[in-house]
Amino acid sequence: MKTTYVNATIVTMNEQNEVIENGYIIVENDQIIDVKSGEFASDFEVDEVIDMKGKWVLPGLVNTHTHVVMSLLRGIGDDMLLQPWLETRIWPLESQFTPQIAVASTELGLLEMVKSGTTSFSDMFNPIGVDQDAIMETVSRSGMRAAVSRTLFSFGTKEDEKKAIEEAERYVKRYYNESGMLTTMVAPHSPYTCSTELLEECARIAVENRTMVHIHLSETEREVRDIEAQYGKRPVEYAASCGLFKRPTVIAHGVVLNDSERAFLAEHDVRVAHNPNSNLKLGSGIANVKAMLEAGIKVGIATDSVASNNNLDMFEEMRIATLLQKGIHQDATALPVETALTLATKGAAEVIGMKQTGSLEVGKCADFITIDPSNKPHLQPADEVLSHLVYAASGKDISDVIINGKRVVWNGECKTLDEERIIFEASRYKRGLQR
């Protein structure tokens, strides 16, 4: 099946960050086979021609760190620091989850993400009360591209920890897929919730199965103080000593890093998922993304969960990310528009090991989203497309979402998920949680 999308303004996010004012994209099945400017007059014979009527077409957004199973917990524990927020609000509520609640919560997060332009994401879920196969089936049904990882903790007895490791290894062996729509990573929660032995076992599983690692690291000053007091090392050095960085690793946050740590992370291909809104809301601080990029670290933007954000709008994350860097450095050139877009598209895709997506180029997966600026005053005049995408647009502006060549959202309607049922069930299950 060959489909041509014509009469579009195409934000390619190729090496030149080229914007094609009037162009077309040809998709064959799940792959982009041509991207050109001008009227459609291709040598390709196509099955369908779709007039985009001047819509902006850009790569699907890539969320490098989130927790969709937590989506029912939006608004729980506002105005709290990370540790008391986790210990007194989030974990007690997660302990009440059943497989049905977990699926309903996941569906809500998936619906919000895909309708706001996210096509790929990397996720960590707490396995308590969760049917992991049902979660993967739910993500698959959404049509999204994802790395969904089972989180490991050292809570409970040593026997509990051993069982968690065994189950995590089985999960990795079942779901790891280097190039498919769904994959997984090895995901120890953090250095403050995992024993040294568990972190070492996670490193072993990652090496033996050739998977990536996903972990919360260097998120707060308290974490750095506590880990240094307990192990005599800061979190980065401690994680490295456990062997975690033998495989490409995504660290969520990286708020509290010094220059030598940034250099070390770059040298060892440790990537950072930058969560600006979540870090601000939990009072964790502001990650120095400018310094990370200058050190050579791969960085991707992320939302974290709705419990600490409180939405999954990647446009909002792009905007706050660039504004924060300008503010903390008192430098209006810090994290310019093109860089912010890169960190939410092709750069983010590279962070989570999905190089097959993130830009609109021949050979890439057909993952793209559209915005119709014609009826949106906040996107007018419509000639400064890149600026408007970062500084004016929001996830509510999305018209269409195509993932792997399939129309997942079309004219604002999700084709893969039952929006009415999902919203009803989310409200019903949320009322049943004991706060």
From Swiss-Prot:
Function description: Catalyzes the deamination of 5-methylthioadenosine and S-adenosyl-L-homocysteine into 5-methylthioinosine and S-inosyl-L-homocysteine, respectively. Is also able to deaminate adenosine.
Listed CDD domains: ATZ_TRZ_like
Catalytic activity: S-adenosyl-L-homocysteine + H2O + H(+) = S-inosyl-L-homocysteine + NH4(+); S-methyl-5'-thioadenosine + H2O + H(+) = S-methyl-5'-thioinosine + NH4(+)
Protein name: 5-methylthioadenosine/S-adenosylhomocysteine deaminase
Residues reported to bind substrate: 94, 150, 189, 219, 304
Record: residues binding Zn(2+): 65, 67, 216, 304
Gene Ontology MF annotations: 5'-methylthioadenosine deaminase activity; metal ion binding; S-adenosylhomocysteine deaminase activity
E.C. number(s) listed in UniProt: 3.5.4.28, 3.5.4.31
Gene3D superfamilies: Metal-dependent hydrolases, Urease, subunit C, domain 1
Native source species: Bacillus cereus (strain ZK / E33L)
